[in-house]
Amino acid sequence: MQVLIVRLGAFGDIIHTLPLAADLAAAGHQVGWLCEDRWAPIIAGSPVIQRIHRLPRKALKDRALPPLARFLALRRVVRELRAARYDAVIDAQGLAKSALFAALCAAPRRIGHALPRAREMSWLISRRRTPVAATHVIDQQRALGLPLCPGQHRRGSWRFPLPAWSAERRWAEQWLARAGLTKAWVLNVGAGWPTKVWPRARQVEFVRLLRARRQPALLAWGTHVEHDLAEEIQAEAGHGILAPPTSSPQLAGLFAASAVVVSGDTGPLHLALALGVPAVGLFGPVPAERNGPRGPGYRTFQAPGAAWERRDVSKVDLGAIAAAAVVVAAEAAMRERLACVTASA
C-alpha cells in the first residue's frame, strides 16, 4: 500500500513522527512524506521513506509573494501528490493546513487524530480518527498507523530511521578535530519558544562547571539570536567553542561525535535521541513525560510553570533547574548509555 504522511514541521515534530514511518515500512507499506522544504533534509535519504514532497515555505508564509505565484506553487504540490496515487494518507499534524493537503491528495483512506489532539477543525477531514490513548507524543503518532499495521507500534522500542549522513559525519569529525574538541559536551543554547530557553545565567554557570572540570564544551545555536546568546555565554563563562553554522544533517554529525547533549525542549534535543547520543532535556511549559527522551542514556528535568506558555518567561521558572544538577544528570546519562552499549555488544 502507498501511504502518505503529512507532517509539515517542525524539526522536533518531524523526529517524533519518524517511528510512525518505521512502523509503516515494517508492515510492508511504501511511505511518502509531505513536509515544508526547509525540513526535508531531516528525512531525505531515510531508508523507509520512498518519496518526499516538499511544500515551499514561502507559498505558506510569505504574504509578499503575489497570490498567483502562491497559488501556482501550491497547485504544483497538489498535482504531485495526486500523481503519486496514494492509497492512504495520515494527517500526523492535526491542523487545518495539514488536513487540507490530506484531503487534496485524494487518497481513499484518510486517518488522523481525534479531538482534542486534532485542532482547527482538522478532525472533520479524517475518516478514521485515532483517540489519544498514550501520554508520549511519539506513541500518539505511532497509534495513527494502527489501522494500517495493527499491533506494529507495540513491537520493541522506538526506531528512528534517519539518513546515513555519511558526508556530514565526516565533515563534523574534521571540524571537531580542527577545533581540538574530543567528545565534547554540547550545550544547545536556544529553543523555538522563549519559555523553553534555559536562562543565560544558568547556562553560564553550566559552562563554568565544565571549565573547572576541563571538559570541552561546544555551544550549538540555530538562529542569529541564538548565535549572539552563545557568544555571550562563551564570553562570560570564559570557556566553550561556538559551533559553526550548520544544516540539520551537519548538526547531527557534530552530535554523533560528541559525548552528551544538553538542551531545552527543541529539535536538537530530539535529534540527539534519534541518534542514540546521551542527552539531558530541560523542560518547562511542555511536560517531559509527553515530549522528553526516555530510555537508557537520557535524563529530563521539569521546571515549574504554566503549561503551554510560549512567550511569557515570567510564567515558567526554568531557572529552577540547577546547573550542577544537570552536570550530574549528564554524567549518569553517559554511564547508563555506555553500559547499555556494552551489554548489547
List where the protein language model places each region.
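Catalytic machinery of carbohydrate-active enzymes
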Residues: 1-345
